[in-house]
Amino acid sequence: MAIEVRPATAFADVKTMVGPKRPDANVCWCLSYRLTSSKENQGLVGPARGKRVQQLVRQRPPPGVLAYDGDEVVGWAAVHPRADTSFARNRKVPHVDDLDVWSVWCIRVRPGHRREGISHHLLAGAVDFARSNGAPAIEGYPVDNKGAKLDLTMAYVGTMSLFEQGGFAKVADTDSVLNGFPRVLMRLDLR
């Protein structure tokens, strides 16, 4: 298995990774944090959510990276400048300085491909993507689960251990809690 991580420019593959099973569903598409306006997020319903993601995929930079095993898409990581996300105004996640930092907030591995190290490839790919687009630093907001089992539906934020293994360091606590675990701010300087 040779995993390759590429910018998310193929809408069909993004849809495979984060699109809902029902086209009229009002969930996922990895938009909740990507959109800076909660009003826009709540106003996008059903197929309009997918159309918005289709627009984002055509923009430069695209909204994240995809992992492939050969021609098969097996993973997704959302990564973009923090200023273009809801983290720009999030009161629970602190800003530690004024750098134009990038954020990685969702790491998703396709069922049937979990426990193969793909999340590590995705995080490394997100770092490379941010660096190639001029990011001075990249940060994530994983849970500090201290090795305890994490509900699979909440694992999308990653774990502190994953980010540490990717070279990130904890720089701050947050006021955010997910699945009963505190989230921490992890950062990697890219300068």
Q: Which stretches of residues belong to each language-model region?
A:
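Conserved N-terminal entry element of GNAT/NAT acetyltransferase domains
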Residues: M1-S38
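A short helix-loop-beta-strand connector motif used in the catalytic cores of GNAT acetyltransferases and
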Residues: Q42-L66, A83-S86, S103, F181
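Conserved acyl-donor/pantetheine-binding loop and adjacent beta-alpha core of acyl/acetyltransferases
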Residues: R58-R60, Y68, E72-R110, R114, ...
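Conserved beta-strand edge residues that scaffold enzyme active sites
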Residues: D71, D144-N145, V177
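Conserved acetyl-CoA-binding loop-helix of GNAT-fold acetyltransferases
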Residues: V104-V109, R115-S132
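Conserved GNAT acetyl-CoA-binding A-motif
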Residues: L123, A130-A155
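C-terminal "cap" of GNAT-fold acetyltransferases
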Residues: T153-G166, A172-R191
